[in-house]
Amino acid sequence: MSERKTFFADILLPVPIHQVFTYRIPFELNDQLQFGVRVIVPFGRSKLLTGIVTEIHERVPEAYQAKFIEHVLDEFPIVTAKQFQFWKWISSYYMAPLGDVMNASLPANFKLSSESKVVLHPDFENDQQLDEREQIIVDSLHTNDQMDLKELSAVLGIKTIQPVIKKMIEKRIILSIEALNERFTPKSIVCYTLTDTFADNELLTSFISGLESKASSRKQLEALLTVLSDGKYQGNSMQPVARKELVEKGVSLSALQTLERNGILETQRIEVSRLNAANFELKEKKSLTPAQQKALEEVRECQKTHIVTLLHGVTGSGKTELYVELIEEQLTQGKQVLFLIPEIALTTQLIERLSAYFGEQIGVYHSKFNQNERVEIWNTVLANDPNKFRLIIGARSSVFLPYQELGLIIVDEEHENTFKQMDPSPRYNARDAAIVLGHLHKAKVLLGTATPSIESYTNALDGKYGLVELSERYLGLQMPEIFCANIRTEKKNKSMHSHFSSQLMDGINEALNAGEQVILFQNRRGYTPMWSCEVCAWTPRCKNCDVSMTYHKHTNSLKCHYCGHISAPVGSCGACGSNRLKMVGFGTEKIEDELSLFLPNTVIKRLDLDSTRSKNAYETIIHDFENRQIHILVGTQMITKGLDFDNVGLVGILDADMLLNRPDYRAFERAFQLMVQVAGRAGRKNKKGKVIIQTSNPDQWVLGRVMEHDFKGFYETEIQERKLFFYPPYYKMIHLTLRNTDERKLNAAAQNLTDKLRLVFKERVVGPEFPLIKRIQNFFIKEIKIKIEKDASDRKVKEKIQEMIDLFYAEADNKSSRLSIDVDPY
């Protein structure tokens, strides 16, 4: 009898280490292991982790004795070879541990460890059929609320419990704490139906007769009859009718509310799926205008010779209609399509518009969705189901899905900095990662925007990308007129109304009198960013961070926007005791508050992080603004993305100077993009809109380009500055950030690392220096910046940086300082 061979497997684990780990395969598992399946392995003294098999071989590890693999979780791979190749590129390019990439890629339910905690699923019912082990776990969770897998292993008396837990999660008996803590809110819509009392035909007929006899009740009668005609019946009960559908048909919302108050109608919240679009009625595609048709043909022509094409279309030019045509072509060929958007929470309208064309083929993927939905989409994409989830709409994390037949990637609003992951590692840019993903799959990539990033536009001009310009608004609509209001002059003339220039107030009143709506943009939330003592200039500061506290009136509290620390408002100066404290600056909350004093009969709402803590809150505000129930919408940059309103007569930008004066080489680029994007909300259907920008310096050159809608003029000036001062796209940048709770140790460590880097990179190293905010969450911070020539070998540069980092951490004094690496900071 021949001796059986011993095999080993390299396992990728979700730990922040730059290596895979080799484990021995038990003979009985030899036939079960293959690339891409998950296994349970021991790690450290007592942990059990879920890892991914990346290679099977016969090489015995020399540095340590290989431990045995405990269990195989999958019959088939959950990760593809192309996907793993993509992970390795992310790890290499962004200098991130491969385990961090795995962590970012996989839904939490795929990564159970012995320290994972579980609870009973909210939908679990005690009458479910359970086997003996499942019953013991359920009984234990009834007693303890939540338990980790190590504790449950002890209760069952078995070492490897993950397979049991996996099965119970799939059966919706239990839920991981990671899934529970996602604060997932099911999407719901408000519907109207008859109350039980008025389900009686005789009573209802009598009430309708009463309405018919009163001229003043005409709107109530129309509303009730529409509900009755639209409501489908199952037996004797009427199915609820969506409020949105009723309002779209011209039904008066106030009439519906009156009928509800009087007990004839009642509202119900009906939960609808976020995953598929069965809730939307399919529509015919819109006909393209000649300008759109020409742009579409140019895109197709560019795609013959380029993987990547940049579609530069002005705001309101109808880029979405082009996307629809290109998506349909790919789906018809049996391909998958990825539609990347900057923030899923801000794109309700886009999802609804695409759902109207593609129905159940759409899947929405985002890290805020619950684990069961994310796993469902993952498995469906992996299985390459020909009928479901062929079009994925998602934010950054959707680039990590296991695509099989990817034909097209669309990156909408490609300039947005929210495509860049900041913390934790990997700090990748989803736009750039999508381009690499396109190359791996031989899929076409379309970057769409009204305000291209400097890098993307340069690549297009250099011929690296295809370039298509769409310079006409849809159906010949005119671009808005843009004016600057000189607040320096108005303050001098004492014509300001608090933070509103007379020019802006006149514009607001003019728009409201014409029955139009207004959007006001201020890229700062809260009531006021700072309190200051008039005697000694003291300001209340965060105890954890080197930053002033922001006052929030609705909670009457001071809050740090960096660490979340909250404290009560102060009544006197913390330095000199004076009670002469004044508020300096203004945020969206203060604008809303003060504007309501000037315009008491106007409905004013905010759209910012504080007012949209839940998804439903965001959707309600957008829905109410769409249906003209809100007259003025005050918001941060949330109002610049993915929104399309047809009745906005005026857009006001309250503080352009704050946007332009940030200490960042991208400040002008970001300011131009934000102002052009928010200006694009004005004037959609049959009237030219108006934009008023408040500034102390109306002659500032960027404002001139914004007023003229002149992206090319802006680009030509900005690109010269970048070249002159060695910034991207002419140089690549890598930021190294060190953190330590001890400022003295941080200073020494930062200088040590800088000296090592200068041995290799000479004058290309800038720093070390404190950032604008030198302490966050009790950690002092120092930054080192490296500028590298564009044509330098990327691989060699990063190898040298890593070599210097390894030497740095070989010295004991440096080990207490935390290091993070940001390649291509954005």
Name what the model sees in each region.
Residues 31, 400, 642, 775-776:
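Short glycine/serine/proline-enriched coil/turn segments at secondary-structure junctions
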Residues 96, 108-122, 134-139, 145-151, ...:
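C-terminal accessory/connector segments of nucleic-acid motor ATPases
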Residues 4-6, 18, 187, 618, ...:
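A general secondary-structure signal for short beta-strands and their flanking turns/coil
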Residues 283-289, 293-296, 304-747, 755, ...:
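Inter-lobe coupling/hinge segments of SF2-like helicase ATPases
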Residues 88-91, 153, 505, 592, ...:
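Generic solvent-exposed, charged/amphipathic alpha-helical segments
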Residues 1-449, 463-477, 760, 794-802, ...:
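Accessory, non-ATPase domains that flank or precede helicase/AAA+ motor cores in DNA-metabolism machines
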